[in-house]
Each structure stands twice: as structure tokens, then as C-alpha cells.
Amino acid sequence: MIRRRIVGFLRRPLGSEGGPLVSPIVGLVRPLVYPVNRAASPVTAVSPVVRPVGMRFISGPVEREAIRAGISNNTDFLHVQNILLQKDQERQRRELLLKDADNFFERFKVKTKWVLIRGNRPFSKDEIYTLFSWLLLSQIVWIVVGTTTFLSLVIMASNTMFAKEFVGETLGNILNNNKYINGIDFTFKDAMVPEWKKKMIRFHNVTMKSNDKDDTKGVSMNLKLNQVEVSLSVVKWLSGKGLVNDISIFGISGDISINDKKESNVESLINWVTESNPTYELNNFTINDSSTVIHDKANNKHLNMNIYSLVIPRLRFDHLLTDIFSADVLVGSVNDSLFNIHKRQNKLLPAFFSDKGRDNRSKTIDKNENDGRFTNLRLNAININELNLNRTGAFNWIDDGTIEISADIMIPNTDENNEGNGLKTLLGYPGGDPLVNKNTPENKYVVIDVKFKFKDLKTKFPNEEPKLSSGEKILSLNELKPVIAYVNSRSGFIHFLTSLEDSNQSRTNVESVDDNKNWGLSNISIRRKKSYPNTTVISSKPYWNSTSEDNERNLPLPLNQEIIKFHNISVQDDNELVLRCRIVQNVEQLENLSSLKISKMWDTITMEMYMDLLKVVEDWEYRNKNDWMKQWGATFASQLLLVGFGAMV
């Protein structure tokens, strides 16, 4: 039916109602309607067709839509045929050009031009500009995306073209001429080795040494780095956060000397890095197997600092303290005293973050507002003299002893681009305005719960009052007397026995009995090493056949049983002094700082320790007073009783 309508439409004269409007359409549509011989011409192929009797031609949108569909199908077919014909001609032309080429260079030239411009003609100016801009842009993208790969290829090519010593010396001169690290000479003894799998650049036998020209900083170093792996990022450098993205150091050994020219130059060991670029940031910082000796020439002492493993996922020079406390792993030792920083392994929050553990004198913190991480810090027992704690103005009355430190630290999330904080800011919190941003740096705090355990303290009466770093007095000398008396009362007996043992070891001849009577004690002591435990413990079998009464009382099954204690160790460890304090510090006050002594947190910790110490001393005085009153009352009552009995007799 559609075919009949199209035939009637085409037989109408041009310009009539419902007839064809353009003559070329007839040539496109008629091959669809009339079966033609493709070998013949289009004009002779179409013969006039007599309209059959009874055939009707209906003009309307249906007929026109059918015509358009037929024209579209035929046009697509012709377009495809034209494309195939052009490709066949191009292929034949390319084969002719390659056939005419005599050598490899001409064939390469033909193939290159054929890929670029589909021909063998000379390049035009526009094409040359296009190729140049494309090559330049591609190289820029390659450098930005693969900076480490690009630089490693450049250095590796330099190693093949020049001597390895020359390349290492050139890299050292580039770093030595940096204005930010003036005074430190870098030396690369071996060549660079690219690590393609790790996407790092590896250097071996790198030396960092202070030059003699700049000795005003008060810090000199001579360090040897066995292996250094570095990855670079141009995107990070363009954002102002430094070119180095990740850095891993393996095997640090050497000496660091702190001169006695200026007292403030002690912090310059870290300040020479932080002051160079406060916005510098490392995405991953790792140190393994580090052993250095820090010489303090002012106090004529040295510290053996060892770092076994250090992994910091993000190190920012303007948030140096908070990022170090947020380290995934930090394990090391100071003068053979272990210290470590790690994430809390239990899922429960510390007591001081709960509602029951909050202190009225400290600012209450909502843990939801900070949304940070919890870190545990621990330092094993170390001598106070090695930390120079007795040389500070705050604890000038301590002469000797050991200290053990443990702390639970809550560090807020200081990432400004954190999506979780943005969502919480948008939703707000109960009891507050949801439009107020509660996660701004002004509302973020670092909360630290510290426990100090002093043992075997020896005190002395100082000539000056204890002072803070700001010069403010903490206690007067009269207020300090009860503190010294309390410490001496707890450790005096232990120190007496220790001095007696030392005197016995130094004697070569046997003392007379009269000398021992002067001490009031027999010259007997148990010699033991410091590594021995305070309590000798013997293992015992658990009570498997426990009675029902024990189960009802929930009595634990003893696995160990204490059988003996040394005679010079008291049951309650009276020679230990435990102080606890809690510090709340705004995170903004810890920015751009390299040590706690520079910040106000050190003074806050000192004041909290003194407050806890004064409470302990006050409680000790109250108990001594009650004991004295009880003893006096009992003595007076007994005397009255004896007098009464005497009068009766």
C-alpha cells in the first residue's frame, strides 16, 4: 500500500498539490519504488508507469513521513559507500608511497606523515604549531603526573653519560645552595637507583655534615644515612607544600652536638627545618634503625637516642607536635630507656573523656566535637639527671631519682578538608545552633592525661624558689619545706639502707661491733641486682576443684602466690611518688612550635603537678596529725590509768 502511494505521489506534476517539490528527490526515491537495473543509467532505468485502474493517491503526513524515511536510508547507504571508497583509495595510495620508498628513513617518514596528516605533503604552519603545542603539553602532563619517574630517568641518564661521583656532587651542590638549609652540606657518595615498583628514588650513603663556616646556630651534626627513598610531586609543590611527597630513611648513625653559646639554640635542631617553610608537608615520613648520640656541651652530658621504627602518615611543619603525637608507630630508647607512641588498642575511651572522669578545674570537652584519635605515650624509668629535670627552675629541689611517664592523648582532627567534619558542622549538635561552626580551630582542643611516677627521689633545699619558664614563682621556700619533708619521709629509710650497703661494699676490713652499735642496726644486707624483681613470685596450680561457695563469691583463681619480699622493700612501695594531671590546650596554641618547652603547655603541666603534689602533702600532714593525736590521747589515757591504779594502791 505504501509503495502504491509513493508511486502516485511521484507521478504528479511538479508544483501541484501533494506533488514532489524538488526534482532531485525523484532520483533518490524512485530506486526504492521501482526495481531498476544498477548497470543502466538512472535516467533510462526508470520507465513511465501507467497508473492502474482504481488506484487512489492520498496526500498527507503519512506519505511524506514515508518519503523522508526512504530518503534518509538511501542517504546513509550512499554515505557509507562513499567512506569505504575513500578508505580504499587512501590504502592504495599509501601502498604506492611505501612501494616507491627506497630505504627505512623514507618509509618511516611516509608512515609518520600518514598517521599525522594522511598524506605525503609538507607540513603547514598550523600543523607545525599544533604538533609543537601537543608535544609541549604532553611533556608537562608527564612531568606533573610522574614527577618521580621523570627525575629518576634524568638522573639515571646522567649516571650513564657522566661519572657517578660527578652526579652525586652536583645533587649535593643543589641542596647546599638552598637558602633554607644553609649550614648543612649534603654528600651523595653512590649513584641513584630507581625503585619502579615503589615509585621512589633511592639514594645510598648520604652524608649530612655541618660546615665550619656557620657555627652560630649552636648545633653541629655529622650524620650518615645508609639509604634514603624519596618520591616527588609537582602538584604538591605548586600548592606550596613542598616538592617531596614521601620520604623513608633507613639506618641513621652519627653525632649531634649542642654548643653552649646560647641557651635558646637547643631548639634550633628542629627550627632549622621548620623555619625554612612552615607550610611544608610530607604525606608519609618513615625512619628505621636510627642511632645517634646527642652531646650537650653546656651540661657535659650525652644522650643515646635510638629510633627503631617511626611511621608518621602526615607530617606538617606547622603542626609538628600534633603530627608526632598522631604517629602510627614510634618506638625507640633514650639511654636504654624504652619509649613508644601508638594508637590506643582498646575500643573503650579513657576515663577522663567520659562524664564520670571529668575534672571541674579542667575545661570539659565533648569528644564528638573533636572527632580525633587517641594515642598512648609511655616512657620507661629513666634517671632525672639524664633528662636535666633537676636543672630546670621548676624542679630545682630534686637532686636525684628516676621518673616514669605514661600519657593518654586525644588529638582533634585538624584537617580542614575533612568531609566528616563538614557534615557534622552542617547538621550541628543537640543543644546548640546548627548554623554555628563548632569544628573551627578555635573550638578544637588537645586533651592529655599524664601520670608521673617518681621513685627513689633525693631532695635538697634550693637557694631560689621554683619558677616557671616565664619567671613566675610557683612556691615560696617556706611552702616548699613540707614538700621536701614529705618526700624525705617516704624515701629516707630506703636511702639509709642503700647508703649503708654502699658503705659496706667499700670497706675492706671488718668493722668493729661498736661501730655497728652506733648505727643501731646490724651490718646485714641482701645484695641484689637492679634487674631482680621487687617481689619473688612462685607459680602455683589453679584451684580447679573450687567449691560452690567460692563461685558464689566470685573469687578469682590464684595463679601466682607471693612468698617473700626483700627486707629493704616495703609492701606499699613507699619510695614511689605518683602524680596525675590533666591538660586541656587549644590546638591553635600548638601550631608553629617545635617543643613543649616553647609552648605554655609545659608550664601548665608543671602547675598541675604541683597542685596534685600539694594535695598529697596536705593529706599526709592531716594523717600524721591524726596519728599524733591518737597516739597522744592513748599515751595520756594510759598515764591517767596508771596514776589512778597507783592512787588506789
Swiss-Prot record:
One protein family per Pfam: MDM31_MDM32
Similarity field: Belongs to the MDM31/MDM32 family.
InterPro entries referenced in this protein's UniProt entry, alphabetically: Mdm31/Mdm32
Origin organism lineage: Eukaryota, Fungi, Dikarya, Ascomycota, Saccharomycotina
Protein's UniProt keywords contain Transmembrane helix: yes
GO BP annotation list: intracellular monoatomic ion homeostasis; mitochondrion inheritance; mitochondrion organization
Main location: mitochondrion
Function: Involved in the organization of the mitochondrial membranes and the global structure of the mitochondria. Also required for mitochondrial distribution and mobility as well as for the maintenance of mitochondrial DNA nucleoids structures.
Topological type in the membrane: Multi-pass membrane protein
Transmembrane segments: 135-155, 629-649
Mitochondrial intermembrane side of membrane: 156-628
Keyword field contains Transmembrane helix: yes
Mitochondrial matrix topological domain residue ranges: 15-134
Subcellular locations according to the entry: Mitochondrion inner membrane
Transit peptide limits: 1-14
Keyword list, A-Z: Membrane, Mitochondrion, Mitochondrion inner membrane, Transit peptide, Transmembrane, Transmembrane helix
Cellular component GO terms held in the UniProt record: mitochondrial inner membrane
Protein name: Mitochondrial distribution and morphology protein 32
